[in-house]
Amino acid sequence: MQLTFVRPATTDGRSAGPVGCPAGPGGVTDLLSGLSRTEPPERPEGVCIRRISQDRESIERIGRLYFRSYPDGEAGICEEAVADVEATSAGDYGTWVPEACLVAEEGGEPVGAILVTDNPPWDDVEGLIFIIDLFVAPGKRGRGIGGALVGAALAAVGDREVGLRVESENAAARRIYERHGFAAR
């Protein structure tokens, strides 16, 4: 089951509650929403976080990371994963938010990414900033990379309301989002 999380916008710049990401095929979601933080996020040592370039080579690298980051078959085949990242970049899931679409790199290699859009096409999150996906390479999890990406993306969007969806059984992702002030909707 998918959970949708929303973090409502507030004027004091502090977080209000947990969040989530889109689930795979057949999943159900609850909405989580939250307010972005204004303080810079902590970053794991040796990890660089920067904007994702929308050139073909960069999008393909992020698509391959997306494919590797999920269990076999969950992201389809590699070409489908790349096509999904391309579709996000092209605006199929809302307007790409360049300052919040970020990649974490270690030694020049991508180890995690967050894809964020504005005004996604789904009725329950219309008008929100929306975290389309957050993914970290399997061997790099548990080091704070996902949390650093979420924190950096939230800082980039200011005090806008942010939503996302996450699989209910994905406890690690839920903890990341809840630490950043998101709550189930």
Give, region by region, the residue ranges found by the protein language model:
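A short beta-loop-alpha structural element at the N-terminal edge
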Residues: C48-F67, P71, A75
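Conserved beta-strand in the GNAT
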Residues: C101-V103, E109-D118, F130, F135
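Conserved active-site tyrosine of GNAT-family acetyltransferases
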Residues: A16-P18, Y177, F182
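Conserved acetyl-CoA-binding loop-helix of GNAT-fold acetyltransferases
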Residues: D133-V136, G142-A156, R174-R179
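Conserved GNAT-fold acetyl-CoA-binding loop/helix
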Residues: Y70-A90
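A conserved beta-turn-beta hairpin within the catalytic core of GNAT-like acetyltransferases
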Residues: N119-I131, R141, R160
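Acyl-donor-binding surface of acyltransferase catalytic domains
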Residues: M1-S53
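Conserved beta-strand-loop-alpha-helix junction that forms the acyl-donor binding cleft
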Residues: V6-R14, P138-R141, G163-R174
